[in-house]
Design a protein with these regions (language model features):
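Trp/Phe/Arg-rich N-terminal binding region typifying the photolyase-homology
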Residues: 1-119
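Glycine/tryptophan-enriched, flexible segments
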Residues: 80-83, 101-253
Length: 255
């Protein structure tokens, strides 16, 4: 969180989302367990304490710092004999040698059923650390009075209002600063922080398309194109991580 591409308002959004998640998990029998520290040290302590032999996590494409951290975690797990199982969260594929067939793979993933949340979670013998405030981890205050609030329920409400009313002028209004804030979905942070899944947004869009309402075919098609673009451009970063530091085209490297 001290990287130059992070901010206090992003952390506040995450904090609100985590509080809401903690409440939902507690209602199912097991609150969220938070640990603060370096990833390898925290995971090593948890695995030793609870005799963990397998870790489940999701794939992400972020920046050079997180990539280095992830490699450290994978190397530690390999040396410790701990199995790592990674789950794909977007339509981004690891270690692709060709983009041929990418769109078909995207559609295949997004059309799989969404898994329901469990009704009950078994309790674990673990005490949670306190969720750190911004000043605890060296993040400068970054007030933004009209920013979006982090919370799955808030994201679902935005998605509902987009498909019911706000999104009807989406295609025409998205490029207009005066109208875009109301007519666009505003789902980006909820997708980025996992409050809503890409598959969930895609399948809701497909369901709305099937309603066949007059005047909605074009905006829904445009919205679905943006969902594809989301993963298309992240795939570029996955395939070319050096793009964070170098121009995409090698002809510009010496400039």
């Amino acid at each position: 969180w001290q990287q130059p591409d992070m901010s206090g308002r992003q952390y506040d959004f995450l904090s609100e989302s985590v509080v809401a998640l903690d409440q939902e998990l507690a209602a199912r029998g097991q609150p969220l367990v938070v640990r603060v520290g370096e990833a390898v040290a925290v995971l090593a302590a948890l695995c030793a304490r609870h005799k963990v032999r397998r870790i489940h996590l999701h794939q992400e494409t972020w920046n050079g710092w997180t990539y280095a951290r992830d490699r450290q975690v994978l190397a530690w797990a390999r040396d410790a004999g701990i199995e790592i199982i990674e789950y794909q969260q977007f339509g981004v594929h690891r270690r692709m040698t060709s983009r041929r067939g990418w769109a078909g793979k995207w559609d295949q993933m997004m059309n799989r059923p969404c898994l329901p949340a469990p009704d009950h979670l078994p309790a674990v013998d673990a005490v949670s650390d306190a969720w750190p405030a911004t000043q605890d981890i060296g993040i400068a205050n970054d007030p933004c009075p009209h920013r979006q609030q982090g919370d799955r329920a808030a994201g679902l409400a935005l998605m509902h209002s987009f498909f019911e009313t706000r999104g009807r002028d989406y295609r025409a209004a998205m490029a207009t600063p005066v109208r875009a804030a109301d007519s666009c979905s505003r789902l980006s942070p909820y997708l980025a922080f996992g409050c809503i899944s890409m598959r969930e947004a895609w399948q809701e869009s497909q369901a709305q398309r099937a309603r066949g309402r007059h005047g909605w075919a074009s905006p829904i098609k445009s919205f679905e194109s943006r969902l594809h673009w989301h993963c298309h451009f992240i795939q570029k970063l996955e395939d070319e991580p050096a793009a964070e530091f170098l121009p995409f085209h090698p002809a510009y490297h010496a400039l």
